Regions:
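Active-site entrance/lid segments in N-terminal catalytic domains of soluble metabolic enzymes
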Residues: 1-162
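Conserved active-site-proximal phosphate/metal-binding subdomains
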Residues: 5, 19-42, 146, 151-167, ...
Length: 313
């Protein structure tokens, strides 16, 4: 695909010409963009899906009428109440600072982690009382940082590593990546895509196959799914936004547009439509395996890599 800084203007926030800028009220474009979705689904011969299926594909649980809007403040607050009620042992915040919830989480004995992509965000969550930080670089799948993994980890370690443990993340798919994160100062590694391609992972089989069939240049960063930049396996839906020169709506509105396509792509088992999110370490993953086997290889590979590195000492 090339270097991410060469993304077309239509998929970079703030880079669209004034005539194509998103208005202050994104709902003003909702009708036009929903028609774009319908046209895309017809062109790709995708099956129709009901609203509930579309919401689930966009990441929302089933909710009755009058429930909170997807990805709204009320939506997240309702989810947090469940986390607290169930007294989960570990909670990881993927977007934002969990500071306002820290006292209630800690009173339950919950260990709280935050995934961050910049040094300033690391400093903010540490000041709020976080237990661990995951420094995830641009190589990572899903929502990620504009800063590369190898550059981000040591800077975060230098900034806050004396106050909380820092875990490295972003494109780490084997033991060598784990070792590299630790050499950069992290206490360990946060691995995502490698575990998506396991028998136990809760994604569709065809999406696991898409991971094992992809190579190093097969991921892109696009706002076409959620409205925030996210790394995913290249697909026709993301390409359609570039071709049309359209600027995706900000979160949470873009999920209203992409939800039907995501659900229909899953229903039709279309690797070219909904292959899913994945990091740049995807080219190291060649088969669907049991999670325990992946874990053993990560540990063994890290130990070998760290042992090999010692010949310089």
């Amino acid at each position: 695909f090339g270097v991410d800084t060469l993304l077309p203007a239509s998929v970079r926030r703030g880079s669209a010409p004034q005539s194509g800028a998103v208005p202050e009220n994104p709902m003003a474009l909702l009708g036009e963009y929903q028609q774009f979705t319908r046209d895309f689904m017809e062109r790709e011969d995708l099956p129709e899906v009901d609203a509930a299926m579309a919401m689930r594909a966009a990441g929302a649980p089933e909710m009755g009428k009058g429930g909170p809007q997807l990805f709204s403040r009320e939506f997240f607050e309702a989810q947090m109440e469940v986390v607290i009620e169930e007294k989960v042992p570990v909670y990881a915040a993927g977007l934002g600072n969990p500071g306002p919830w820290m006292d209630r989480l800690h009173s339950n004995g919950t260990k709280v982690m935050a995934v961050i992509g910049k040094v300033k965000h690391a400093q903010q969550v540490v000041d709020s009382g976080i237990d661990m930080i995951v420094a995830q670089g641009h190589d990572g799948g899903g929502h990620n940082s504009p800063i590369g993994t190898f550059s981000l980890i040591p800077q975060v370690v230098d900034a806050v590593g004396d106050r909380v443990p820092v875990i490295g993340a972003g494109g780490i798919s084997d033991g060598r990546g784990v070792a590299a994160a630790m050499i950069l100062g992290a206490v360990g590694a946060w691995v995502g895509t490698a575990f998506l391609a396991t028998e136990e992972a809760g994604i569709e089989r065809f999406q696991k196959e898409a991971i094992t069939e992809s190579g190093d240049a097969d991921t892109i960063v696009s706002r076409s799914m959620t409205g925030k930049p996210a790394r995913m396996i290249r697909n026709k839906w993301a390409d359609a936004w570039v071709a049309a020169g359209k600027e995706p709506l900000p979160m949470p509105y873009q999920s209203m547009i992409s939800g039907p396509v995501m659900a229909s792509g899953i229903k039709a088992q279309r690797k070219d439509i909904m292959p899913g999110f994945a990091g740049q370490g995807i080219g190291l993953i060649h088969s669907i395996r049991p999670a325990a086997e992946v874990m053993r290889d990560l540990v063994d590979g890290a130990e070998r890599a760290l042992a090999d590195a010692r010949f310089y000492s």
